[in-house]
């Protein structure tokens, strides 16, 4: 049986990892073993933080809505409850944007929630 040294495929695999590690400092961008560890960790963090990003943005939207609701004399929970009773289906992302960019429009939504509450 002939000996297989895996020259081309091994180099291809290593170069793929080193390409992903481009821009890392020191040995992490030059040495295969260090680069593998760094790239694995980076990909794990990226996977995790794509999910954390969704939580963080929702928390930011809720904070902004709560601040705007309190200006209009409601707490966040009372505003959301009033909107549910009034059958107003507007998501938190849009409400937070309204609160920042159009305070009068948000005040109208808060008034609708207050009327049903």
Curated annotation (Swiss-Prot):
Encoding gene, per UniProt annotation: rplT
GO CC entries: ribonucleoprotein complex; ribosome
Described function: Binds directly to 23S ribosomal RNA and is necessary for the in vitro assembly process of the 50S ribosomal subunit. It is not involved in the protein synthesizing functions of that subunit.
Alphabetic keyword roster: Ribonucleoprotein, Ribosomal protein, RNA-binding, rRNA-binding
GO terms of molecular function: rRNA binding; structural constituent of ribosome
Keyword rRNA-binding: yes
Entry-linked InterPro entries: Ribosomal_bL20 (IPR005813), RIBOSOMAL_L20_CS (IPR049946), Ribosomal_protein_bL20_C (IPR035566)
NCBIfam families the UniProt entry points to: rplT_bact
Similarity remark: Belongs to the bacterial ribosomal protein bL20 family.
Protein name: Large ribosomal subunit protein bL20
């Amino acid at each position: 049986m002939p000996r297989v040294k895996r020259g081309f495929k091994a180099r291809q695999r290593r170069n793929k990892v080193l390409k992903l590690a481009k821009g890392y400092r020191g040995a992490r961008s030059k040495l295969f073993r260090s680069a593998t560890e760094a790239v694995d960790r980076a990909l794990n963090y990226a996977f995790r933080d794509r999910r954390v990003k969704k939580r963080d943005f929702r928390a930011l939207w809720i904070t902004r809505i709560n601040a705007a609701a309190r200006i209009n004399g409601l707490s966040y929970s009372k505003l959301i409850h009033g909107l549910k009773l009034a059958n107003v289906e507007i998501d938190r992302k849009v409400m937070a944007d309204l609160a920042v960019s159009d305070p009068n429009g948000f005040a109208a939504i808060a008034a609708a929630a207050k009327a049903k509450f």
